[in-house]
Amino acid sequence: MKKKLYVIIGCFILILGWILTYFIVNNPLIIPSPIDVFNSLTDLFKSKSVFIDIYETLYRTIISFIISYIIGLIFATIASKSNKIEDIFKPLFTCLRAIPTVSFIIIFIMIIGFKRAPYYIVFIISFPIIYQAILEGYKNINPELKLINKLDNYNPIKNYLLFTFPMIKTSLITAFISSFTLSFKVEVMAETLTGSTRLKGLGFLIHIYRYENDISMILAIALLIVLLSSLFEILGKLVLKLIKE
């Protein structure tokens, strides 16, 4: 109960800070009021086309995320078998983490165009994070238990399903939950920066309103993204809690 109270207090402080900033700046073209943003959000839902934008963004996020999750799981499983293999993979993942996201966006736009670039950008950002999270799950398995299990069971598939999977299940789900929310945010960013006005999506919607200098509507879309991201995190925590029980 106290935790929820602190969250409410935190939200109140944010809104209060926003209102104070609005009055200090005294320019709605730079800092719109919370009421203006709320009205813009209402107008956004009245148009109903926003639901298509949400669907398109989620669709691209899910496709890219599932591919990155499966490949991340495969790479993490292979790397968990040997420290040497992990060291071989290390330069690849170091590079993927070190290269700025903007560089990937420019490269993919030049190579594959605006339409498909967001898919690749989400994959390239999510893949190393998923890999590392799952690999840590493998590393947390007690080495003695691994040895005992190998002695008792020589079937690798049965070994994985009956022993390894239950041991890393929480790590797999945690990686899934945390990475999906990140993937969603990256997808929106990729859509915004690729800058196509012909495609549907929340990021493309931001790009359109940026050219119209409609700060109120941009903040309304940003608020919608925050609400959706929070919803994904809440649902993820509920799923994780149910599985742990």
Where are each of the predicted segments found?
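N-terminal signal-anchor transmembrane alpha helix
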Residues: 2-25
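Periplasmic/extracellular loop-to-transmembrane helix junction in inner-membrane transport proteins
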Residues: 24-66
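Alpha-helical transmembrane segments of multi-pass membrane proteins
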Residues: 51, 55-64, 97, 161-174, ...
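Transmembrane-helix boundary motif in ABC transporter permease subunits
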Residues: 63-93
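C-terminal transmembrane helix and the adjacent membrane-cytosol boundary/short C-terminal tail
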Residues: 83, 174, 215-245
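Hydrophobic transmembrane alpha-helices
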Residues: 92-98, 111, 120-134, 196, ...
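Glycine-rich helix-loop "coupling/hinge" segments at transmembrane-helix boundaries
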Residues: 110, 186-225
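Membrane-cytosol interface at the C-terminal ends of specific transmembrane alpha-helices
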Residues: 114-179
